[in-house]
């Protein structure tokens, strides 16, 4: 991973990361990181390198990658999931879903189908959509995918900015980001969300 990061820098390309997730969308339910220490060590080093850059977007990516470490180690989401409120997923059949990370073994529901209504607002503002959002608020998965994390990082930027500033200053002063110190932000999230 770190070699790819350096290659992307040399090519002046952006570098994005992800971890295994299980869901109906991926047609996979048995993904598991088995070499947790090695993978988290690589993410740790990536975070250190991202925080050395002079680009605030890289610092935000460092925060996202800290969330990946937390996810891989089985922790709760650092920020709430607001899938179905801040974003949605449209499948090829017209189903409007809160996200593409749902598992039938956990829960699976649609907000509605575009083929059955006159316009999107009928789905987005429906009672069914409200029911699905309540399920999201109690979802046990603790996913950490860019599609659901990026919107809440932007929404709660004033909450995560102190972490970014503190750790940028640490790196400037020659220290490392402590990736064992995982921040959690309570911004109205349901206490049941992310309890695996």
Regions found by a protein language model. Name each.
Residues 1-83, 87, 91-92, 96-97, ...:
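Radical SAM enzyme [4Fe-4S]-AdoMet core and its adjacent flexible, acidic
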Residues 95-96, 100-196:
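Flexible mid-to-C-terminal extensions adjoining Fe-S/redox cofactors in radical SAM and related proteins
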